[in-house]
A protein has these predicted regions:
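Short, basic/aromatic recognition patches that contact phosphate-bearing ligands
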Residues: 21
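N-terminal glycine-rich flavin-associated loop
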Residues: 1-17, 37-84, 92, 96-129, ...
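Short, well-ordered secondary-structure micro-motifs within conserved domains or adaptor modules
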Residues: 31-35
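Short glycine-biased active-site loop of nucleotidyltransferases that positions the nucleotide triphosphate
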Residues: 24-29
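C-terminal substrate-binding/cap subdomain adjacent to the FAD-binding core in PCMH-type
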Residues: 93, 112-230
């Protein structure tokens, strides 16, 4: 990848950084020679006891999820994947977070370190692989949502979390206005809510955590239990 960037720099030729191209509908249309990152893939380091995983940019999110699942762990931000081939690099570059965003945080919040090829062909490392990395400005998190404008992400270290022991989805009948008021109220209380959506008629909630806390929250909130695949 460094060689391709340096060749483009010498020509000069604009580059279009691309993994699975599953998020091409985002942002403006770009032109340039395609630099495909999918061959630069694989898990570099993973120690479940440290809750940190390091992967190359072309690693499919499905592969990352499978490795984490084997250790009963997961990505905290639950990023949306527009296709089975969506990559780790694309997840960071686009900075999209899933339904856990209001409760767990964004993709940016869990980036510990990155390796990046700059527009001048330099392969730099920012951040590290620990949470308490406070030396200097946290440039690694700038890469989240940068859409490749700050450089080509080649490697990223992410904080991960243990999977919840229990998950339950419920449906509560109420209009949008009521749902917004309830969510604002519940957001100030220790409820194990990890996702919410409104379909026009009902508020759907996902509860995750220990068996006791999920059962207690369900007893308090009520609602119809939804199919586990919801």
């Amino acid at each position: 990848l460094v060689e391709q960037v340096n060749q483009a720099l010498a020509t000069p030729t604009p580059l279009r950084i691309q993994g699975a191209n599953s998020k091409a509908f985002l942002g403006r249309v770009t032109a340039g020679e395609i630099l495909d990152t999918r061959s630069h893939r694989g898990i570099v380091r993973y120690d479940p006891t440290e809750l940190v995983i390091t992967a190359r940019c072309g690693t499919p999110l499905t592969e990352l999820a499978s490795v984490l699942d084997a250790a009963q762990q997961m990505l905290p931000c639950e990023p949306p994947a527009f296709g089975d081939d969506a990559t780790v690099g694309g997840m960071i570059a686009c900075g999209l977070s899933g339904p856990r965003r209001p409760w767990s945080g964004s993709v940016r919040d869990f980036v510990l370190g990155t390796r990046v090829i700059t527009g001048l062909g330099k392969h730099l490392r920012f951040g590290g692989e620990v949470m308490k990395n406070v030396a200097g400005y946290d440039l690694s998190r700038l890469m989240a949502g940068s859409y490749g404008t700050l450089g080509l992400i080649t490697e990223v270290s992410l904080k991960v979390l243990p999977k919840p022991r229990q998950a339950l989805s419920i449906s509560l009948q109420m209009n949008v206005e009521q749902a917004l008021l309830r969510l604002a109220e519940w957001g100030q209380q220790p409820l194990p809510i990890s996702a919410a959506c409104h379909d026009g008629e009902c508020l759907h909630l996902r509860l995750e955590g220990g068996e006791g806390s999920v059962a207690a929250a369900h007893d308090r909130l009520g609602g119809e239990v939804l199919d586990a695949s919801y």
